[in-house]
Amino acid sequence: MVDPVDAIGKARAAVTQRAELPGMSLMEHLDELRRRIVHSAIYLGLGFAAAWVFHDRLVDFIQAPLKNDGKSLNMIHPMDGMNLAINVSLVGGAILASPFILYQVWLFIAPGLYQKERRFVVPFMAATVGLFLTGAYFGYFWVLPAAVHIMLDVFGKKFTAVISIEEYTSFFLSIILGLGISFEMPILIFFLALFGIVSPRFLWKNFRYAILLIFLVAGIICPMADAVSMCIYAIPLLALYLVGIGVAWWVHPSRRKAKAAKAAKEAAH
């Protein structure tokens, strides 16, 4: 297992090393942060406005798995319909605005990065958005239809389904956003390895613990309690963990130091 004290020390050293780079004062950092937050909020507002134009189609989109199973949503409270339109527009707007918001994050952190680390910006943004959309796609076309079928047609076949808009929206977003965020695992491993907090050897050595943790996470975000559904959640996450090990091997400081030492040795000869 990882030593928490050692991990914290490595993280602190990485932050301290960047703090020593020539840059802005604290007040300048705060002012820059304020600007980036304002710009991100503007992009989010524009994304919301664009999504609102198509909110009827977005509502049909999230209802499709239910309609394909012969079910429909029920309005329990007078505000349910409007709340659904607002929620789907917010989520859709956030997805539309995410590349621009990530760019604002990049503009804020770029002054504190070395030139060799800045080359990761385009792959980072593309991978972050791509992995989230892949997780959301997997959730919508695979997990959600299976969940609807199991809960309504298998366990609920003896009952009359009265599905409220609020409960279904929460259920839908927990699957789509939960898997979208979970699919960002290689990005998290990338940064942990880049700063030397974890190594590919550590990740591989503790693979069995990762399996337990991934199945625990799958059990938390999975709406079904059966083992098959948990495996549907967990197997892609295990594959992404293995991808993360490859990413860690690629960016870990020990590999970069070894390459630099080899280059210096060859230059000496």
Locate the predicted segments by residue.
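Membrane topogenic/interface segments and analogous intrinsically disordered interaction regions
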Residues: 1-269
